[in-house]
């Protein structure tokens, strides 16, 4: 624009005012630098989490050939009708494909393929309008200046802010809890998720599970009942393993444990040569063992916090345990936010007491899509992968990892909303330029006014970002 004006300036009338709009151009460059700065800082956050020496929790696609993974896939497929990606939580020491994810452009940048040509088209239209409109009656130079001013008014400069600030804000919040989203491409990858599963101990932490009473029968002692239970659940893991481990701390002994069967409502095992059944009253009855006063179980469990579990040793009833499960305070909040993001939640468990009925007594499951997934094999329990490729990770906890997952949907929603704001801003800029050309005031439009118009739209975009993230 300025080169052309240099060549034609000598041929213009003496009173012609030529505007260069350099300040607006410099403001655009400044916005580009701010965009790059926020992106670099966001990538530093991601690298610091990914490079941590701690094992990281990661969001992984639900893949594998083991029995539990197949059952989980089938359960989610039935619930979701076969649509959407299914994810689970795993642990890994090293994160693969970090720089590949950082350098991959997301799909929402394709919007610029339409907005920038649209801005150039507006400039061309305003140039022609300045030449031909009966309202403007301006010369070719003034019309050319009007077209260039229109381009500077409608260029998606605020789009750079839109593509950097929401993600930067979410990354900063995630990093404060030891989590991160790696690269902009991960937003697309993980926002399409329809289901995610994680372990039961995230719902019922160790300090929220307590064995209230142990009623023993015959020659069984309380110590022996605790010993058998701790060895069996030590194999399966979960909240009962944590609770029993704290009760037997300092009394660990080597033992031989073989799990013969893991059913939905009980576990069949051999502990140091003794045949042990542990589970719900239905499991005992199915194995020919009469529970202790089963008629009182319904009344005990109706309160919503205590579950009843039985133990049989060598085909004889041995103990009745009453166990209190208190749900984690933050779980329902996480569940609510995942539900808003359109995700179904699966809770993986070996615990006979944790089922859909038990969970519905503690969480308003009818309001949220949540299912209990009964595991059958222990081969992958507690497995830490040496290498894993994931775009969402946390060095602190599964809860913080899930919050990072929730941010993906929020960021994309914010970007889409702000894109609509930017399109509206472009329309307003085109209308203002057309009005200025019609009034013959294009020579009065200065560079500062154009820059202020562009930066004005950062205010509503910033407000939208703060409200939605």
Predicted regions located by residue number:
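ATP-binding catalytic core of ATPases
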Residues: 77-80, 84-113, 215-264, 285-288, ...
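Asp-based phosphoryl-transfer active-site loop
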Residues: 187-213
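A short acidic/small-residue loop/turn micro-motif
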Residues: 212-214, 219, 325-327
């Amino acid at each position: 624009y300025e080169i052309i004006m240099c060549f034609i300036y000598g041929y213009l009338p003496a009173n012609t005012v030529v505007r260069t709009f350099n300040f607006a151009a410099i403001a655009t460059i400044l916005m580009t630098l701010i965009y790059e700065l926020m992106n670099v800082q966001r990538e530093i956050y991601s690298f610091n989490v990914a490079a941590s020496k701690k094992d990281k929790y990661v969001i992984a696609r639900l893949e594998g050939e083991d029995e539990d993974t197949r059952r989980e896939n089938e359960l989610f497929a039935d619930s979701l009708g076969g649509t959407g990606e299914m994810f689970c939580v795993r642990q890994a020491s090293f994160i693969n494909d970090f720089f590949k994810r950082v350098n991959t452009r997301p799909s929402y940048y394709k919007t610029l393929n339409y907005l920038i040509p649209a801005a150039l088209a507006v400039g061309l239209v305003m140039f022609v309008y300045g030449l031909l409109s009966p309202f403007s009656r301006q010369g070719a130079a003034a019309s050319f200046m009007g077209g260039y001013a229109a381009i500077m008014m409608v260029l998606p400069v605020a789009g750079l802010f839109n593509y950097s600030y929401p993600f930067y804000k979410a990354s900063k919040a995630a990093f404060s809890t030891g989590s991160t989203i790696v690269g902009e491409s991960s937003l697309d990858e993980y926002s399409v998720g329809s289901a995610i599963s994680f372990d039961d101990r995230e719902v019922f932490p160790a300090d929220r599970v307590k064995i209230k009473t142990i009623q023993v029968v015959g020659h069984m002692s309380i110590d022996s009942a605790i010993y058998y239970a701790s060895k069996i659940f030590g194999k399966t893991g979960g909240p009962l393993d944590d609770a029993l481990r704290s009760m037997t701390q300092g009394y660990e002994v080597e033992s031989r444990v073989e799990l013969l069967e893991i059913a939905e409502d009980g576990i069949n095992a051999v502990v140091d040569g003794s045949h042990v059944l542990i589970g719900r009253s239905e499991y005992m009855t199915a194995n020919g063992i009469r529970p202790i006063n089963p008629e009182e179980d319904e009344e005990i469990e109706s309160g919503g916090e205590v579950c009843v579990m039985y133990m049989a040793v060598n085909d004889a009833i041995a103990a009745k345990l009453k166990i209190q499960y208190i749900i984690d305070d933050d779980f329902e909040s996480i569940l609510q936010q995942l539900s808003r993001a359109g995700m179904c939640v699966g809770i993986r468990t070996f615990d006979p007491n944790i089922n859909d009925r038990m969970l519905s007594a503690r969480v308003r499951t009818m309001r949220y899509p949540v299912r209990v997934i009964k595991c059958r094999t222990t081969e992958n329990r507690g497995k830490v992968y040496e290498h894993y490729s994931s775009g969402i990770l946390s060095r602190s906890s599964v809860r913080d990892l899930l919050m990072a997952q929730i941010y993906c949907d929020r960021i994309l929603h914010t970007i889409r909303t702000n894109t609509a704001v930017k399109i509206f801003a472009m329309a307003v800029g085109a209308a203002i330029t057309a009005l200025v050309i019609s009034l013959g005031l294009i020579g009065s439009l200065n560079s500062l006014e154009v820059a202020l118009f562009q930066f004005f739209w950062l205010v509503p975009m910033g407000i939208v970002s703060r409200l939605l993230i």
